[in-house]
Amino acid sequence: MKQHIKNLPIILASGSLARVELLDRIKIIPTQIIPAYIDETPNLRELPAPLAIRLAYEKAIKVASQIETSSIIIAADTVTAVGRRILPKATTYEEVKHCIKMVSGRRHRVYTGLCIIKKENNQLTFRQKIVQTIIKFKKLSDEEINFYSSLDEGIDKAGGCKISGYAEAFVSFISGSYSNIMGLPLFETVNALTSLGFRYSNNTPNVYKDPSTNHLSKPSIS
């Protein structure tokens, strides 16, 4: 007789559509989305990897403190850097242009800090991981830089570019997790969830059974 598997509700501590879509790829649907609004300013001399894991931890803790029910909270933060220099999350076309110039013809690194908290009976169990992917862009012409910086896709993206968009045409080399570049390393996410007791099951509301027959609505953002 098969054991009925009941997973805890999964809360995504991010309003990122990309992270929702990435979870969809591995057939996981967050029960709820609660964006964690925190100060993401790097500390003095803070390096990219420690920054990413610190921000992921702060996001997870903030959301965990806001909920009362037993849940699994997934939080992540992605940081792009050239050497030790952290590139901003571009908010203007000029920032996009600055970032693209910085990575043109150079290897750069994308770090995603992952923090997953299992909150059960007011006890917190943590899983944390920092994942690094190395990317190299070809040497871009002024025309390519100007064209890309005129697009919307780099706005609000770490490092001023969207790897799954037009910027993919610039990539000559990738070493590491592709999903990490997009904001959530899926291999590490599933491993962490599994270690906290999550299981795939046809009885589980957090998992798609059959996309062709189950039309499940996307979670709402709180």
Curated annotation (Swiss-Prot):
It comes from the Bacteria. SUPFAM superfamilies: ITPase-like (SSF52972). GO terms for cellular component: cytoplasm. It is an enzyme of class 3 (hydrolase). Keywords: Cytoplasm, Hydrolase, Nucleotide metabolism. HAMAP family: Maf. This is Nucleoside triphosphate pyrophosphatase. The lineage of its organism: Bacteria, Pseudomonadati, Pseudomonadota, Alphaproteobacteria, Rickettsiales.
